[in-house]
Each structure stands twice: as structure tokens, then as C-alpha cells.
């Protein structure tokens, strides 16, 4: 759907070409924007079917436990794709990955991300537990700088407000990202991005 306020130029030309190549219909209308868009500067809306994914046992995972902020989830998807970690496990209760705020914040990365919801971490662990597990916790003793994964691994992050429950300290090797005492903690997308970079920096050039 294209808004009448969309200016002609390279962006519209590129979008038109992509739609033609994919046999996707382009509809010029303003009505749908009044219903669906919460922003005044939105000029394109894409409609797609929700899809399901499967996680690979041979790839590294990022695990989000009870994420509640849609924008954060989308931002993490974007970073994860950039660092070659497009396998995401999401532990309920959690935000809907198809929330428009997630899709927007991911900048399209959601369409290249395999994500699966689980009702508990135990459910995830039963299927994918045969790997190195690294829960990120503020009271952990092991610094991220000292983490050297030797095989397939999962980076585990908690809720934006509460972090991971205490019982995660008994799972795998809990890790902390060192920072100055002038802040209480890093926000979730930044912490996850730093962790993914450190864990994949030796292989990132191969992606």
C-alpha cells in the first residue's frame, strides 16, 4: 500500500521494481494509513502472512526470556542478523514478534530470522540443551571478555526490567558485561549486541 504523499524518486522506483520482480501488487490508497499507521511520516505499508520457523541445532542461538518491549526485540533481531546469529528462541510470556513495532525496529531482519516460542526455558533446553549456555546476569563472576565458546552456544538474556531469575546462575556459565559503576546496567539491545559481537568476532568476516 502506497500513500499519496510518497515522493517520486529512487526509493519509489526501487520499490516498484522489487514488487514487479516478486509479482506483488502495489495499491495506492490513503485510507488504510488512517487505520493502521500511528505515524504521520509513514508512506508504505506491506502486507504479509505470518510464518513459522524452526531453529537449527547446528547454529548458535540467542535466547530472550520474557521480553516485553517490541522495539527492543526488533533491534536485537537486526543486530543478531548482522552478527550471523539469526536463530532466536523466545520464552513466554513475551511480546508478539509480528507486532508492527518489532517489524519496524528490525528494519526487515525479521524476515531473515528464524524464531520459535517456548512456554518455558526448560522446554527449550530439552530440545537444544546440548550446547554451551551463557546466561547474562549482573551478579555473574565470569566476564564476557573471558568467554571463549568452543562449540555451539546460546546467549541468554532476561526481561528488560527484571533480568534473568536467580536460578539461571545454575545453568551453564553465567556471564557479566563489565561497565563502570556510574550506571546500573546496560539496556537489553546494547547488552545483547555487545555479547553477540564478542562471541562471533572471530567468524564475523566469514558471514
Predicted regions and their residues:
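Short, charged, surface-exposed secondary-structure boundary motifs
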Residues: 36-39, 124-125, 144, 184-190
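Short, acidic/turn-prone active-site loops that include or flank metal/cofactor-
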Residues: 31-33, 93-95, 118, 160-162, ...
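Active-site/ligand-binding-proximal alpha/beta "capping" segment
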Residues: 135-184
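A glycine-rich helix N-cap at a beta->alpha junction
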Residues: 14-36, 116-119
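Conserved beta-strand segments of alpha/beta enzyme cores
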Residues: 23-25, 114, 132, 173
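Structured adenosyl-cofactor binding patch, chiefly the S-adenosyl-L-methionine
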Residues: 44-46, 79-83, 95-111, 166-207
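Short, charged beta->alpha transition segments
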Residues: 31-35, 43-54
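RNA substrate-binding interface of SAM-dependent RNA methyltransferases
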Residues: 2-7, 12-16, 47, 51-140
